A protein has these predicted regions:
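Alpha-helical protein-protein interaction scaffolds
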Residues: 195-256
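Bacterial N-terminal signal peptides that target proteins for export
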Residues: 3-23
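Signal that preferentially marks extracellular ectodomain short beta-strand elements
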Residues: 139-153
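Solvent-exposed loop/turn segments flanking beta-strands in beta-repeat/beta-sandwich domains
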Residues: 105-116, 120-124
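Extended, polar beta-sheet/loop recognition surfaces of beta-rich domains
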Residues: 46-57, 132-135, 153, 165-204, ...
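Contiguous beta-strand segments within globular domains
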Residues: 87-104
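Solvent-exposed serine/threonine-rich low-complexity stretches and specific carbohydrate-binding patches
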Residues: 124-138
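Internal, hydrophobic beta-strand segments that form the core of beta-sheet-rich folds
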Residues: 153-166, 223
Length: 256
């Protein structure tokens, strides 16, 4: 039993203002069907996401897993919940240890190894997490840990999330890749210092993050609000709007 399956870390995010029990690697309460329903509803954009252009020379990355074969076929539509900006899978965060979100198109089990890595400009590992998790198809949250280091303000990093899905070929995997940059947290002002943030204030903070192009905090708040009140139409529309503006197309329930 490894680190990620041997304990559950519970933390209350002051920023999100919603008490959420996070496992180290947390399947979220958005199943494949629910995720697709949210994303494909026809709504107006309630939050404006204005991303900063990616660093010149940033690799394009890969938002969708792509074609594969064998046991990996069911995971080929693995999708990173990260924007594609000017053709580059690119995001910004204010956190030294941001959470990443992925749509996993098929069930995960303890027998399916996963790996998430973040590397600096010299290819040194800042984050390297190898784990497994029992989770249905749907949205998966991957919080990062500080075992090797943290993201530095002003620096850009490459990341890769991989599912090693073919036991007959241990090196075979389906992967998504991109670039993340840490920026200063001036956008949040004094709000982030409050230990109790009402939903209306959270939504305003979400709007601030989105307008500054700070993806990880914006999408994290949007998902948390939707989880806390799944029948709230505004939260549904906001989540859909962010996916649409970021160029994220969810995988279908059926592998093509």
């Amino acid at each position: 039993m490894n680190l990620y399956t041997s304990f559950v870390t519970k933390r209350v995010s002051r920023l999100l203002g919603v008490a959420i029990a996070w496992s180290a690697i947390a399947p979220l309460a958005l199943s494949q069907a629910a995720f697709s329903q949210v994303v494909f509803s026809q709504v107006e954009q309630t939050v404006q996401f204005l991303p900063t252009p990616p660093d010149q020379g940033s690799p394009d990355g890969r938002q969708r897993g792509g074609a594969t074969r064998g046991d990996c076929l069911e995971y080929q539509e693995l999708t990173a919940i990260v924007p594609k900006v000017d053709g580059v899978v690119w995001s910004q965060t204010t956190s030294a240890l941001p959470t990443f979100f992925f749509q996993v198109p098929a069930e995960l089990t303890e027998e399916v190894p996963l790996e998430f890595v973040i590397q600096d400009s010299n290819d040194a590992y800042v984050v390297r997490q190898q784990f497994s998790v029992d989770a249905e198809a749907g949205l998966l949250a991957v919080p990062t840990t500080a075992e090797l280091g943290e993201l530095t303000v002003g620096e850009s990093y490459s990341w890769t999330f991989s599912i090693y899905c073919d036991e007959t070929r241990p090196s075979a995997s389906v992967s998504v890749t991109g670039t993340v940059q840490r920026v200063g947290d001036e956008v949040v002002g004094s709000v982030a210092d409050s230990s109790e943030i009402l939903p209306a204030e959270q939504f305003r903070l979400l709007q601030q993050y989105a307008s500054e192009g700070i993806w990880h905090e914006a999408i994290g708040i949007a998902i948390a609000l939707h989880q806390a009140d799944p029948n709230n139409v505004t939260y549904q529309e906001t989540l859909q709007s962010l996916f649409t503006q970021a160029g994220i197309v969810p995988a279908t329930d059926e592998v093509q």
